[in-house]
Amino acid sequence: MAKTELDLLIRGSVLLTMREEEAVIENPVVGIRNGKIVLIMQNDLFTEEEYTARKVLDRSNTLIMPGLVNTHTHLAMSCFRGLADDLPLMAWLHEYIFPAEARHVNPEMVYAGSLLAMAEMILSGTTTFCDGYFFVDQVARAAKDAGMRAVVCQGFIDFPTPDTSDPSRQMETAERFIGTWKDASPLIQPALFCHSPYTCSPETLVRIKEAARREKILYVLHLSETREEVSLIQDCYGKRPALHLHNLDVLDPDTLAVHCVWLDEEEQGVLADCGVRVSHTPQSNMKLAAGIAPVPAMQAMGISVSLGTDGSASNNDLDLFREMDSTAKIHKVATGNPAVMDAARVVRMATSEGAGALGLQDRIGSLEVGKAADLIILDLNQPHLTPMYHPFSHLVYAASGADVLTTVIDGNVVMENRKILSFDLEAIMREVEKIAEKIRKSCRK
């Protein structure tokens, strides 16, 4: 009998499917062909006589799990990492970040900064991301070169941007981007990103949402990140931010709201009723002293909450393992309840909930036959991971992105034994250092 040929065969010690049933499989074997998972079983049920593989990854004392999903970031801002810290959000934005972007953001910077950030994500177990920035064709090009799965958002804001000097022509930029990338790669999906209700007029918010609905793509925006934002929107429109957006009819299941730190109970109910999904960014919110989003309350109302890192300039890393740890702990403190945000729930937020937030739940977020082969392999042979009683506990409270040995995206091994295989990381790091030197010189003036 002819053997079934696999592109990749993976063996490990433990596998987390992130399905409701059969969540943990001991001594697993995963078979991959044409970018899809074609078998998952225990090793003692696997027979060498039935299968042959072009490549085998066989490591003892490893954990296999779905790749992590970062539902909110600004990748090219890796070039601004550490430029301005320990500041309130509005001072950070208006005194440092917006001026730096006006001077330095160009296609070359966005490509190099995005690719550097993708290396950081791949090395720390993220396989899919949602990014909002400028010159987004360069973000998409970098994602294609890196082999990452991506939702890439064209940004909108009611003042001149690095890629569009006339705000009234931002939609032309977006239309070109969507036309180029909507069907260019199965791994890349365009989306539209309104910066926030305080930087986008009601007309802009509605116009961009209408375009997103026409194109059947995701609509993303920052929402209620700070108390100051809430007060500003109330003063301008007489409503709290989420109610303002609801009044504009821009909230629906294809809306991803980021931060959501200062939602009151009525606003949470509106988001739940509209099916809006939320990206929680705890480390950025802590660093900017924005506050703690009411995630347990939102989840109790049925709102799907995923995890994002935000950009490197406000975090300052892109390691979702650190976000998981922060998520589990910060809400225990905020609620006074140590049972809130258990480890398994937090891992779901970084995997299956993230996939759902981006509309990719049929493709990624769990390890199942027929789904895309987006997975990571962690090295459990570490002092801080020995012994292991409960895998979810270790992933949230003990592991870090540095424990990821291998990253597979769409069946392709993009990182193996901590080495990026899909592009030249050293060359990109050198390029970003050149960009940073220009930024340093401008800061001295």
UniProtKB/Swiss-Prot annotation:
The keyword Zinc applies. Keywords: Hydrolase, Metal-binding, Zinc. It catalyses: S-adenosyl-L-homocysteine + H2O + H(+) = S-inosyl-L-homocysteine + NH4(+); S-methyl-5'-thioadenosine + H2O + H(+) = S-methyl-5'-thioinosine + NH4(+). Binds 1 zinc ion per subunit. Pfam families: Amidohydro_1 (PF01979). Its EC number is 3.5.4.28, 3.5.4.31. SUPFAM superfamilies: Composite domain of metallo-dependent hydrolases, Metallo-dependent hydrolases. InterPro entries: Amidohydro-rel, Deaminase_MtaD/DadD, Metal-dep_hydrolase_composite, Metal_Hydrolase, MTA/SAH_deaminase. Zn(2+) binds at H72, H74, H222, D310. It is an enzyme of class 3 (hydrolase). Substrate binds at E101, H195, E225, D310. GO terms for molecular function: 5'-methylthioadenosine deaminase activity; metal ion binding; S-adenosylhomocysteine deaminase activity. Its cofactor is Zn(2+). Belongs to the metallo-dependent hydrolases superfamily. MTA/SAH deaminase family. Catalyzes the deamination of 5-methylthioadenosine and S-adenosyl-L-homocysteine into 5-methylthioinosine and S-inosyl-L-homocysteine, respectively. Is also able to deaminate adenosine. PANTHER family: AMIDOHYDROLASE-RELATED DOMAIN-CONTAINING PROTEIN, AMINOHYDROLASE SSNA-RELATED. This is 5-methylthioadenosine/S-adenosylhomocysteine deaminase 2. It comes from Syntrophus aciditrophicus (strain SB).
